[in-house]
Amino acid sequence: MRVLFLIYLILSPFGAEARTLLENHEGLNVGSGYGRGANLPPPSPASSPPSKEVSNSVSPTRTDEKTSENTELVMTTIAQGENINQLFSFPTSADNYYQLASFKKLFISYLLPVSYVWNLIGSSSFDHDLVDIFDSKSDERYWNRKPLSPPSPKPADGQRPLHSY
């Protein structure tokens, strides 16, 4: 449940910005009526000057640039691993410490290039012999091994060996 809340918390500013862009671009009131046009007066004849409402509207290009800059700033900050607590407010109790650490790893790992992550794994200190999935020799040894035979019975002192007929 917390994960869904965090996803909603991250994506909600982008949804509000998209709604504002849509309202400014099409003159719609998206918040009420789910995209249906607001009750606007009928269009004026072509000879009349444009209304003040249209001429005072914010340019979509300026808003797009602002949104792009904000998105780049957030992505850069997360990718650089800077203090993510300043971007998102998290409780700082001991119970949530591990959740916060895994949250940071999740976002940073999705933003890093695959080659960097692969090199990071390759340079770590775990035993590669146990984990090496590309080792074809171990596959050959597994599939070409001989089945184990049961141990041969040894006669006890003073007894004859049993012979099967």
UniProtKB/Swiss-Prot annotation:
Report the superkingdom from the record: Eukaryota
Query: What GO terms describe the biological role, i.e. biological process, of this protein?
Result: defense response
Q: What are the record keywords, sorted?
A: Glycoprotein, Hormone, Hydroxylation, Plant defense, Secreted, Signal
Record keyword Glycoprotein present? yes
- For this UniProt entry, which residues form the secretion signal? 1-18
* Location of region: Disordered: 33-70, 142-165
Propeptide section residues? 19-35, 54-143, 162-165
**GO function term, MF aspect, one:** hormone activity
The keyword Transmembrane is assigned to this record: no
Chief location of this protein within or outside the cell: secreted
Name the GO cellular-component terms.
extracellular region
Glycosylated residues in this chain: 42-43, 45, 49-50, 150-151, 153
Explain the induction of this protein.
By methyl jasmonate in leaves.
Positions carrying 4-hydroxyproline are 42-43, 45, 49-50, 150-151, 153
Tissue note: Expressed in leaves.
Q: How is it modified after translation?
A: O-glycosylated; contains pentose side chains.
Any idea what job this protein has? Activates a lipid-based signal transduction pathway in which linolenic acid is converted to jasmonic acid, a potent activator of defense gene transcription, including proteinase inhibitors.
What is the official name of this protein in its record?
Hydroxyproline-rich systemin A
